[in-house]
Every structure is written in C-alpha cells, then in structure tokens.
Amino acid sequence: MASEGDSIDYYELLGINEDAQDQEIHRAWRKTSLKYHPDKNPNDPKAAEKFHMLQLAYNALIDVQLRKAYDSERFAKLARKRREEAFNFQRKSMVDDLRERERQFYDSLEKKENERDRLQEKLRALQEESANLRRQRENRLREEQEQSKRRKQETPSSKISELDRSIRIRWKRKYADQVNDAYLRSIYSSFGTLQNVVIQKDISKEKKYVYSIIVFETLSSAYSAINAEKPSKIYDVQWLKPPKSNSNTPTEKDTTVEDYEEITIMRMKQKHKQKQKENERKATSTMNA
C-alpha cells in the first residue's frame, strides 16, 4: 500500500481527531479542499499538491475498509516510532553513562589498575548489549515489514480490478438443482470474503454446463480458490480473466466464444442491477433529505 501519501498523517492533514465520524470527515475535507482548490490557486503548484493529498485522505478515511487498513498501518508506524525513540534514548543514556565512568576513571589517579580493568570489561559488556539491542531492533523492524506486507496483500486495493479477483465456475446441468447460491457461498467463503456471486439463470437444455462468477474481495483469496481441490459436483474452476498465453492451440478446458459471451452478459446484467439499486438509494436519500 506504499504510496505518495505514506508520510502524511491524514487526520492531521484534515485537522480532525482519530475518532471523527463520516460527517466530520466530510465537513473538514470540504472546508480545506475549497481553500486549496487548483482553480483558486492557479499559480501555486503546492496548492494543487495539497488538494490532491486532501482527496487521498478523504478517500482513505471515508471508506470503512480502507480506513481500518490505514488505522492499522498508522498505529504500527506510531508504535515503531515510539520504540525507536525509546531505543535512541536508552542508547544515549548508556553512552553518557559510559563516558561519565571513563571520565571519573581517568580523573582519579589514585584508582588501582584492577578498577580500570573492571571498567573496561563493563565497556565491552555495554557494547555487547548495545549490539544485541540493535539486532533485536532490526529483527523487529524486519518482522513488522513482513506483517505489513501481508496486511497490504489482504487489503482491498483499487489497483486490483474486480475482473482480476473473479473466478469462473462450471458444473454439469444435471447438478443445476443442487449447486445454488448457498452451496457456492458455503464452499468458497472459506477462501476469503466474497463480494458477489452470480449464477447463470437461463439454462437451455442444449447447454451441457451451467456457469457462475464469484468475485472475491482480495486477489489472494481468488488464487487460493483456483488452486484448491474442486468439489465433486464442480466440473472446473478457472480465472474469469485468463492469463496471457503464447499458444494458439485451444485446450480441452478453454472457454468457447459463446461461453465467454454468456459470462459477459451475466456480468453486464449484474452491473445493471447494482446501478439500479444505487440509483434507487440515491433517490430515496434525496427524498428524505
């Protein structure tokens, strides 16, 4: 999830608290973005950059899933910063203490030789401890980076299209009454959160197979479903968007042109229904306003 806004605290940028609600976020974004709108500052490139960052902050905080992911990463960064500050303070204290002891040692001409040896031994011990602390810190940072990488892989990203997270499932028509929405969800939800399940409605007797499209929330979930052993009633499971191939020879499992057209029509119908629902929600919201 590394991006141009990683070093910016979105809450500070919008001037809001961490527990701010959607209404507060929207109000703060609207007020600040109007101030830095490029149309009002045509000769100030920094204003355009600030306006862009405000839009990124608003998009990240207004979306529940993106805000949850951002808060998790932000908390980890703050915790890491506090640990680094504590480590630097501890190391500085150790160095200051060591220098003070050395100063006392060299200022005191009456100290015996064995006292100097003892202090030198302690110096080596402190250096060893400092090296151990540094190794521990490096290990923690490496572990946190790996955890952050795993979290990013599980976070919904606009860079991964819905098509890339979609799989196509095919089963024989004789199982049409058994393989339904509930059946598919019970099996494939075990691989991760499902965004949508679309099943072919018009099943012609001439058709040998029935199709379904499942859209996962993450690419890794779709990948797991593709590579898992398929249930007995399922004929095959493939990517909806097939990988590029240099071979022009069709295989036994290749989707025909007609099959792909049916799948495309299913997706278009589903998109149309979603758009209708969205328009109805907007109309209801306008009437209630």
From Swiss-Prot:
Keyword annotations from UniProtKB, A to Z: Chaperone, Cytoplasm, mRNA processing, mRNA splicing, Nucleus, Spliceosome
**Assembly and oligomerization:** Belongs to the 40S cdc5-associated complex (or cwf complex), a spliceosome sub-complex reminiscent of a late-stage spliceosome composed of the U2, U5 and U6 snRNAs and at least brr2, cdc5, cwf2/prp3, cwf3/syf1, cwf4/syf3, cwf5/ecm2, spp42/cwf6, cwf7/spf27, cwf8, cwf9, cwf10, cwf11, cwf12, prp45/cwf13, cwf14, cwf15, cwf16, cwf17, cwf18, cwf19, cwf20, cwf21, cwf22, cwf23, cwf24, cwf25, cwf26, cyp7/cwf27, cwf28, cwf29/ist3, lea1, msl1, prp5/cwf1, prp10, prp12/sap130, prp17, prp22, sap61, sap62, sap114, sap145, slu7, smb1, smd1, smd3, smf1, smg1 and syf2.
Any one Gene Ontology MF annotation carried by this entry is: nucleic acid binding
Entry's localization field: Cytoplasm; Nucleus
* SUPFAM superfamilies per UniProt: Chaperone J-domain (SSF46565), RNA-binding domain, RBD (SSF54928)
* Domain of life according to the entry: Eukaryota
Q: Where is the J domain?
A: 9-74
Q: Pfam families recorded for this chain?
A: DnaJ
Alphabetical GO CC annotations of the entry are: cytoplasm; nucleolus; nucleus; spliceosomal complex; U2-type spliceosomal complex
Q: Does the keyword Nucleus apply?
A: yes
Which first-to-last residue range defines the signal peptide?
none
Q: InterPro entries per the record? A: DnaJ_domain, DnaJ_domain_CS, J_dom_sf, Nucleotide-bd_a/b_plait_sf, Pre-mRNA-splicing_ERAD, RBD_domain_sf
Q: What is the lineage of its organism?
A: Eukaryota, Fungi, Dikarya, Ascomycota, Taphrinomycotina
Please list where the region (Disordered) is annotated.
129-161, 269-289
What is the protein's name according to its record? Answer: Pre-mRNA-splicing factor cwf23
Q: What does this protein do?
A: Involved in pre-mRNA splicing. May be involved in endoplasmic reticulum-associated protein degradation (ERAD) and required for growth at low and high temperatures.
Q: Does the keyword Chaperone apply?
A: yes
